[in-house]
A protein has these predicted regions:
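Leucine-rich repeat
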Residues: 1-210
């Protein structure tokens, strides 16, 4: 019904809060075909658009669906998203050229061929701060070098020096002006400017929640 009655759909948000991963909604039939050519914003929650064990084929229905959405500007995934990041790497290089805002896993982000055009990036699932986490953030920001707004949350482990993650953001996120960080508990720093001058000097907005 949604496909037939809304042929010019521009914004679609399907969120399924409270559902366990095993009870995710099967939406595969909704995202196969050439409908909604003017779609600009797509937000999906705990949905199944494919299986993580699907064959990594160029012809995956959801990937084919995304590849012809030339006007898509915002793409957001939350909850349990079952499609493997290797599928996103199969997107044609000239697809999603208008995409400017992405929310989802780092693996999905770095697999997007259009990541270089992103201006806003959000990692909704908390990252556990380990020794490799700064490298992970650096890799993500190098894949999306034009990002101006970054939102990410961290789970701090006891004794970890949280300032290292700020140094990584300052180095790799050369254009970031809006930084929104959430920590599971009190981080080991208080002010950005004295500690990371090159980051604090260019930020317009900096929020730390704990």
């Amino acid at each position: 019904m949604l496909i037939r009655q809304c042929p010019d759909l521009r914004n679609l948000s399907i969120l399924t809060q409270g559902l366990e991963p095993l009870h995710s909604i099967d939406a595969r039939s909704l995202f196969s075909g050439d409908h909604w050519p003017r779609l600009r914003s797509l937000e999906l929650g705990n949905l199944r658009v494919g299986s993580a064990t699907d064959d990594d084929s160029d012809a995956h229905p959801f990937i084919s669906f995304l590849s012809i959405r030339n006007h898509l500007q915002t793409l957001r995934f939350s909850g349990d998203f079952t499609l493997s990041s290797t599928h996103f790497a199969r997107l044609p290089r000239d697809s999603l050229q208008d995409l400017r805002s992405f929310s989802g896993s780092i693996d999905h982000l770095t697999s997007l061929p259009s990541a270089k055009s992103l201006l806003s990036m959000e990692i909704p699932n908390p990252l556990i701060l380990r020794e490799v986490t700064p490298l992970t953030i650096t890799h993500a920001l190098q894949a999306a070098p034009a990002v101006r707004s970054l939102k990410v949350s961290f789970v701090l482990q006891s004794g970890y020096d949280g300032i290292g993650i700020l140094r990584s953001i300052a180095t790799a996120g050369a254009h970031i002006k809006h930084l929104d960080l959430t920590f599971s508990n009190k981080p080991s720093f208080y002010l950005v400017s004295p500690l990371i001058p090159e980051l604090g000097a260019r930020l317009i907005k900096f929020d730390v929640l704990r």
